[in-house]
Amino acid sequence: MTAVIGVRELGLLDYLPAWQAMQRFTGQRGAQTPDELWLLEHPPVFTQGQAGKAEHLLFPGDIPVVQVDRGGQVTYHGPGQLVGYLLLDVRRSGMGVRELVSRIERSLIELLAGYDVEAHARPDAPGVYVGEMKIASLGLRIRNGRSFHGLALNVDMDLAPFQRINPCGYAGMLMTQLKDQARGPVEFAEVRSRLRAQLAAQLGYAEAKTLTGGIESI
């Protein structure tokens, strides 16, 4: 492990400017551009993937819906959910997309194990599950060998908006969160710190280096 991944902790950020910044970063990066991980939360929003079907949006109500360029179907983001955007040069790493997804899932499973939560991945539905309930969602886009979008881990949030959709296109999919599964207290900042460490280790980086500056500098 020799590479360094830069980490931006962006706080609560509207979805649209974050998505636009991901597109800019991915479009402008060169062969030597270091990889980055963005950790943040979003105000309430539904995002619909490229293959998203309208029938999976049951009754969005007053929550905005954004059509985006990631894989997968509709999902929900809201405060108390930890979102991680993985801006990686997948081609440079020599990692296949399936391997990338597996390593992200392993990062989440190991993080949850640290809270005595037994979680697993499913071959038929990307993401991480506790029993039959989904606790983390994945959705990536690869463009010219570079990834963007990423993961969303339910930490301590209002899960009710998930009832307005078929999460990730699965009718009746039950959602859960770390707060409801962990045996002890859950601090959002600590979960964020553990996630960055797990992702760096599982993806083969020697160091996760904090970057200053928000997306307006990108």
Curated annotation (Swiss-Prot):
Substrate binds at R70, G71, G72, Q73, V74, T75, Y76, H77, S137, L138, G139, G150, L151, A152. The record marks K134 as: Lowers pKa of active site Cys. Pathway: Protein modification; protein lipoylation via endogenous pathway; protein N(6)-(lipoyl)lysine from octanoyl-[acyl-carrier-protein]: step 1/2. Residues 31-207 form the BPL/LPL catalytic domain. The active site is at C168. Its main location: cytoplasm. One of its GO terms (cellular component) is cytoplasm. In the reaction, the free carboxyl group of octanoic acid is attached via an amide linkage to the epsilon-amino group of a specific lysine residue of lipoyl domains of lipoate-dependent enzymes. GO terms for biological process: protein modification process. SUPFAM superfamilies: Class II aaRS and biotin synthetases. One of its GO terms (molecular function) is lipoyl(octanoyl) transferase activity. It comes from the Bacteria. It comes from Azotobacter vinelandii (strain DJ / ATCC BAA-1303). Its EC number is 2.3.1.181. Catalyzes the transfer of endogenously produced octanoic acid from octanoyl-acyl-carrier-protein onto the lipoyl domains of lipoate-dependent enzymes. Lipoyl-ACP can also act as a substrate although octanoyl-ACP is likely to be the physiological substrate. It is found in: Cytoplasm. Disulfide bonds: none annotated. InterPro entries: aa-tRNA-synth_II/BPL/LPL, BPL_LPL_catalytic, Octanoyltransferase, Octanoyltransferase_CS. It catalyses: octanoyl-[ACP] + L-lysyl-[protein] = N(6)-octanoyl-L-lysyl-[protein] + holo-[ACP] + H(+). The keyword Transferase applies. Belongs to the LipB family. Keywords: Acyltransferase, Cytoplasm, Transferase. This is Octanoyltransferase.
